[in-house]
Amino acid sequence: VAVFNEGRIQQLAAPPQLEHWRTDHVMAALLTHGEDLSGDFVLGQAMLERVQRAHLRPPPAVAAADRGTRYAELAAEAVAGETARPSLGGEFPKFATCVHLGEDRYRHVLVKFTETANTPAKRRWVDLLICEHLAARVLAGQGIAAAASELVVAGERLCLEVERFDRIGAHGRRGTVTLAALDDAFHDQHDDWPHAAARLARDGWIDAPTLATIRWLHAFGMLSELGAAGEREGQTHLHRG
């Protein structure tokens, strides 16, 4: 996950909102701070050498038993802009970290978190994080690939820890591409999952079973975002990556 705090963004002379970056902003960022990109790409010799050096030692990690304390600290740092923030879509604030499970076992994760104040917004976030966790378990129970997740209480915050599917063990990486990147490269339509998937299937990039799964997941996602009053809460959660 490419991550950028306020200081790094200022060094790049880039807009504060990542969606407003131009290609030159993106390239400059990836060549100077691109050692932990989504997927398996490493861009430039400097970043490659940084990754290779990192492989010589265990990754910086949070002990599984210490997650409640450390996640509270990492969330506070993320809110204050002291730690780099992931360049990921979605409504919830989040940070990336690694969990040490004991011996030589590690799990790279993304952690979403609520605010601390007891407000209606926080209560909504708590409900949504719990629902997201349960939804992933339902999908996995039906044999559909879904990231493993866990709820962690961190002080006055509730955190949803989601295992990264683009990481394997301490240093392994798995290639990925977002729907946004793939669809925009060929079609540039900026619409929803089913329409984008239909275009990719039409052009031979995905097969019919994959298209059917994407349509099913989109319908499941829309239903899971129904609010208690029956109104749709947040299509923003169904972003394209």
Task: Cite the ranges covered by each PLM segment.
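Phosphate/dinucleotide-binding and metal-coordinating scaffold of catalytic cores
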Residues: V1-G241
